[in-house]
Amino acid sequence: MTKEFEFLKAELNSMKENHTWQDIKQLESMQGPSVTVNHQKVIQLSSNNYLGFTSHPRLINAAQEAVQQYGAGTGSVRTIAGTFTMHQELEKKLAAFKKTEAALVFQSGFTTNQGVLSSILSKEDIVISDELNHASIIDGIRLTKADKKVYQHVNMSDLERVLRKSMNYRMRLIVTDGVFSMDGNIAPLPDIVELAEKYDAFVMVDDAHASGVLGENGRGTVNHFGLDGRVHIQVGTLSKAIGVLGGYAAGSKVLIDYLRHKGRPFLFSTSHPPAVTAACMEAIDVLLEEPEHMERLWENTAYFKAMLVKMGLTLTKSETPILPILIGDEGVAKQFSDQLLSRGVFAQSIVFPTVAKGKARIRTIITAEHTKDELDQALDVIEKTAKELQLL
């Protein structure tokens, strides 16, 4: 037993040497613009809590009331005895919100992509994926028997090349993130849809980082570009801007009926507890009734980005509240993040394998809840630390 998992130890040691080992920070407070880490109050620049909904009073009240009325859990999978009225109400709300015929809720955004891709694709099909798509899309594709082609990131000429060479399939499915989580750029969805229609292909968009952020009342990239009704599959999370937990697929009634019968994560996982489901429903209502959250998000994003650019730091070509500061070296990125934390700013380094080797970064994410004072404090600390590390 002394040699058990020695091969894993060797890899872990290698990760530490190459600065790709991750120390998981523990929060000791509610998620928000400031949080407590290691008994220290710090400005939070690493969460996906874009609109501050994790602590919105309406969501908290909805969750508490649901627990009192329906209990802590559901006790079953959806297809046996775990579908409460509220689960179907949430799906109706999501379908209306995304302007589709129907929707289906999964346990997470990750399992949504796994469930959708693994169930609708066969060996007669081909899936065509952007090279920087999320890991859940990549893993979902691995679960299928379909052929796979990867096109260069947001390169429409390369996408068209792949489409031209893949004419002899039952279905060709183009899959893209709506917003790319590590760079913050938005997929050129109008061009993708135009090519799909030209070559008779299907389109699937993962709006994990766009729902609640882009489009009318946060409906996502499809709505942002005025493409409602022209994208076959929309997927996303209920855990980022929505502020709770889960994932969903939205599309035609035929698609959703099929996923309800074939989507394995949906079929074999216990349904969401009442508190989660009720809070998700309330979040959609808040998006529709309180547009000021999105307005503040974009005001804060514009200000923070302008200050980082003025400072002279190298950013990605972000178009969203995801504002990564490019570092390159993994060790320097980790050092930058650690020093920021010691000075009261929680901004995690992103290193391999989340991004390619040599492309480490500090990924800052701005939220609607940040005050100008908090943003200014964070900017001062970032500038001071960057100068010390000779990044400015």
UniProtKB/Swiss-Prot annotation:
Keywords from the named record: Acyltransferase, Biotin biosynthesis, Pyridoxal phosphate, Transferase
Disulfide linkage: none
Which catalysed reactions does the entry list for this protein?
Answer: 6-carboxyhexanoyl-[ACP] + L-alanine + H(+) = (8S)-8-amino-7-oxononanoate + holo-[ACP] + CO2
- Amino-acid positions noted as binding pyridoxal 5'-phosphate in the UniProt annotation, renumbered to this chain: G109, F110, S181, D206, D207, A208, H209, T237, L238, S239, K240
Q: PROSITE patterns of this UniProt entry?
A: AA_TRANSFER_CLASS_2
Q: List the InterPro entries hit by this protein, alphabetically.
A: Aminotrans_II_pyridoxalP_BS, Aminotransferase_I/II_large, AON_synthase_class-II, AONS_Archaea/Firmicutes, AONS_Archaea/Proteobacteria, PyrdxlP-dep_Trfase, PyrdxlP-dep_Trfase_major, PyrdxlP-dep_Trfase_small
Q: Which cofactor does it need?
A: pyridoxal 5'-phosphate
What's a single GO MF annotation on this record? Answer: glycine C-acetyltransferase activity
| Pathway it works in | Cofactor biosynthesis; biotin biosynthesis
- Where substrate binds, per the record, is at H134, T354
Q: Where N6-(pyridoxal phosphate)lysine occurs, residue numbers? A: K240
List the coiled-coil residues.
none
Q: Name one Pfam family in it.
A: Aminotran_1_2
**Could you confirm whether the keyword Transmembrane appears in this record?**
no
The protein's Enzyme Commission number? 2.3.1.47
Q: What does this protein do?
A: Catalyzes the decarboxylative condensation of pimeloyl-[acyl-carrier protein] and L-alanine to produce 8-amino-7-oxononanoate (AON), [acyl-carrier protein], and carbon dioxide.
Q: How does it assemble?
A: Homodimer.
| Family label | Belongs to the class-II pyridoxal-phosphate-dependent aminotransferase family. BioF subfamily.
Q: What is this protein called?
A: 8-amino-7-oxononanoate synthase 1
Organism, scientific name: Bacillus subtilis (strain 168)
| Name of the coding gene | kbl
